[in-house]
Structures are given as structure tokens and as C-alpha cells.
Curated annotation (Swiss-Prot):
EC class (word): transferase
Keyword Nucleus carried by entry: no
Protein family: Belongs to the ribulokinase family.
HAMAP family on file: Ribulokinase (MF_00520)
Catalyzed reactions: D-ribulose + ATP = D-ribulose 5-phosphate + ADP + H(+); L-ribulose + ATP = L-ribulose 5-phosphate + ADP + H(+)
GO BP terms: L-arabinose catabolic process to xylulose 5-phosphate
Record protein name field: Ribulokinase
Molecular function via GO: ATP binding; D-ribulokinase activity; ribulokinase activity
InterPro entries, A to Z: ATPase_NBD, FGGY_C, Ribulokinase
EC number per UniProt: 2.7.1.16
Gene Ontology cellular-component terms listed: cytoplasm
Keywords attached to this entry: Arabinose catabolism, ATP-binding, Carbohydrate metabolism, Kinase, Nucleotide-binding, Transferase
Biological source species: Enterobacter sp. (strain 638)
Pathway where it operates: Carbohydrate degradation; L-arabinose degradation via L-ribulose; D-xylulose 5-phosphate from L-arabinose (bacterial route): step 2/3
Amino acid sequence: MAIAIGLDFGSDSVRALAVECRTGQEIATSVEWYPRWQEGRYCDAPNNQFRHHPRDYIESMEAAIKTVLAELSEEQRAQIVGIGVDSTGSTPAPVDAEGRVLALRPEFADNPNAMFVLWKDHTAVEEAEAITRLCHQPGKADYSRYIGGIYSSEWFWAKILHVTRADPAVAQAAVSWIELCDWVPALLSGTTRPQDIRRGRCSAGHKSLWHESWGGLPPAAFFDELDPIINQSLKYPLFTDTFTADIPVGTLNEEWARRLGLPQNVAISGGAFDCHMGAVGAGAQPNTLVKVIGTSTCDILTADKATVGDRAVKGICGQVDGSVVPDFIGLEAGQSAFGDIYAWFGRVLGWPLDQLAATHPELKPQIDASKKQLLPQLTEAWAKNPSLDHLPVVLDWFNGRRTPFANQRLKGVITDLNLATDAPALFGGLIAATAFGARAIMECFTEQGIAVNEVMALGGIARKNQVIMQACCDVLNRPLQIVASDQCCALGAAIFAAVAAGVHADIPTAQQHMASAVENTLQPRAQQAQRFEQLYQRYLQWSKSAEQHYLPVATPAKTSAEKPATLTH
């Protein structure tokens, strides 16, 4: 027997999962919430700032692994062969010469700019737009060619430029920046120094403008033209080589072996983004669109290199050789908000209840119980009477739009209301909106010649809310496979750990032994699909019209060229 542990670093918590490598049996699992994040520290939601303190990751990871190990027998603990890591992304942080995230140093302990900039942080909209403009200058190389043609404020270089401009102290102290999914394996293996870190193909290819065809990162002149402050503060290039996640970065170092009570020969596999590993954990095959559904969605599809050819798919979040499965092109898309939209509506409806609880504390237990039932009751009420002929049409841009064609300036829009629109109908409109966003992504692939043969959904919403999933199935007008495991991302990380440890020869072989089964396959209902088709066309019309209201206002180019002094470390 051999056991692998998968670590899945999400937006709110980290999950550890122990998996038997020959059978795929999920033996033990634990979820630990990030304590500082739970307190709302280092975030400024109205200004789209969301930061994670590295100690949240370290403390929660250690607790989660120890809880899992406590559930294993002594014999099972001795059979642990590898640890794999996935995380949200792009979630980068500035590090010093030893690879310490700056927030781990006393002088930066409470500085949000010295922490991990969470994927959904949208403080770098202007910087992202500047990168996109530079990529599209006539007569120059387009370094956005393989990331969909638009650089997002959620991504690596936009965040680096924003923080470097905003915080000279951080810019002075930072020797490099690193993605969370690369930092955790480096931490566990003791390879955190910038020159020792193995950069993952997944994060580098999808978020950092890295591509083999131009030798890695864009040339130094590209960053000089974007803003000289980047090359003044960071040594060019930050990195050159990248590695697929099946390649081990090392083994458990002495400190972490002691802290966890594990031997130092435990292999540490390379890191990747959560949804890419989730697709592997789901057992997805080429040309299967995998929707990893949570607060937002990430949509993953793999395709044979020969099928993709030299085609550059526009409007997505990148196409990268080996970002999901080695030797296949991994294509990424996603919705900036899915479950977050439902949660927003729950907060809106819950506001009067909060006020009542504040004035009548004795009622708080009953009020809290009622609030928990708001969304389930709305779902049930809408399912009984969906009234598709009178459904509000909603644009699902409550947190901007990731795909198709990223635009984080966009806002949610609700249309077609009348005096008969009640709470269940409005909630139904939100459900339909998230389904319409899913279809727009699928069509972004198919209309550019990338076949979608099957569609899979995974995650808590996929398994627990059939009403929402059936609406997605009807809108897509495709069978929708619901994956059995609700921890596919951690399962995928464990699969990569098993390959890195040598238990399986490659990822496809490991998937045959370890990947999740399909729990249920939903079928589209003809009548509902026909009505949703009409609503989807309305959604497209409103999308085209509304987007014009969020065009950026022309401003002089922002640059730090007036500060030419080179920063030293």
C-alpha cells in the first residue's frame, strides 16, 4: 500500500486529503479555516482588495495535515509516499532573498502589500489594461497571444506592478515574487530561495506570459516599456525554466518532517492551480469541459496538441502545454462569480433579520436558523414554479467577467423586473445568469474550433444543489456529469504526488486508479431548454448593450519613469 496526501488551498480554507494510491480510496480528510481571513483582516472589499497572510497558510496547513495523520494508523502513516499541492491563482506574494514572504518579517507583518494577493483581488485593473495595450501595439510581438488576448487584473504581472508602484518599501525589499502553488512545495522541501524555486508550468503559462515560443518570459524591453520600475526593482528574468506538476521539487525537509512526524523521503510534487488539478481528480479526458464550481468557477479543458495546432484561442485564460496533463494543451476559462452571487442575494435578504437580531438579542438563535434556510427555501420555491416566461434577465458580472474576454470593470445588471417579480423569481434569474455565463464559456471554445465532447461539474454546489445543476444542463442543452467526489482538487493533488513518488508511471495511469467516479448524469429537458434558449439570446443582447457603459475613461499613461533610481537589495 502507498498513500499520497493532497493539499488544496482555497479562498477560505485549506483541505488535506489522504488517498490510497492503488485504489483511489479517500482515507481521511480535514479542512482548516484561515483564522485571520475569517476575521476579515487585510481586506478592503469596497476597493476590491483581498489579501492572505502567509501565516494563515502555514498554520492551517500544519493543522490540517496533523488532523489527517491522526486518523491514520501507525502502519498507514509509514506508507505516505508523497504530498501534492494546489492553490487558487493567480495568488502571488513578494519574497526576500531567502524566499520568505515579506509579511513573515516583523517590519511587514501587518502590511497587506507584503502578503499573498488573492486571485480575486482586483486592485490592479489599470495595470492589467496597460499590459493588454502594450501587447496589442501594432508591429510588436503579442505576448497575450496564448492567454486569450486580454491580461487580467487577477494575474501575476498586473499585481506585481500595482504593489510595486503603491509601496516603495515592499518594492525595495522584494527580490522576487512567487505564486502560492509554487511557494508551498518550496516551503515543504526547503527550496524557497528564488534561485532554487521550481516554477510551475501551470501558473507561469497561464498568468505570467511565459511561453516556449519566445524563450520564456517576454524580453526585458517589454517590461521597461510597460514601466521601468519593474526591472529597476526586480532582477530580470524572474525565472526561465518551468516544470509540470508531476515532476518532484524535492522531498520533505528536516523542519517539516519534524513538525509533521513524517520521514524526509516523502516526495513533494510540483504545484498547480486548484482547478487544473481538480480536472485531473475528476478523471477528465481530452475535450471534456470540467467546471469546478464554488464561489466562482474555473473551467478546464485539455486537447491534443495536433488538434489545437497553432491556433490561439481568444477570450480565455490561456492555453498551456502541460498545465493540466503533461503533453496535452490545457485550456482555462472561468466565471468570476458563481456561488458568490447567491451568497450576495442571501445577504441582501438577510439584512432586515440582522437588524431584528440586533434589537432583539433573545431572537438571535431563531433568526440565525432562519437565515440559513433562506437560499434552500428560495431554491425550492423557484423549482416548484420557475415561471420562465417572466424570469428576470441578469448579467452575472457581479465580480467582473473572467471569460469570455476578461473585463473586471463590468458590474452585475438585473433587467426585466416588474411589480410581480418576487424573491424566488429574482433568485431564479440569478441561477439562470450563472448558467448563461457557463454557456458563454462553452461557446467561446466551440466557436473557435475546440470541440467540447462532454461537460462535467464538480464541487459542493454541483453535488448538493440539483436545481442549479439542472438549470445549467438545460441552458447548455448538453448532458451534465456530476462528479462523485466533493474534494477533487485535493484528489488531483494526491494523484500528482503519487506520480512524483513513482507509484504510477504517469498522470493518465494514475487517473485510472485514483480519479473520482461520476455520481450522476443530468439530461437536458427539451421544453425548458427551448425557453432558456430564448432567455440566453436576451442575455447576449443585454451583455452587448451593457458592456458599453463600463468602457474605461481615457487617462494619461501611468508610468514610474520619473523615478529612475535602481532599487538595491
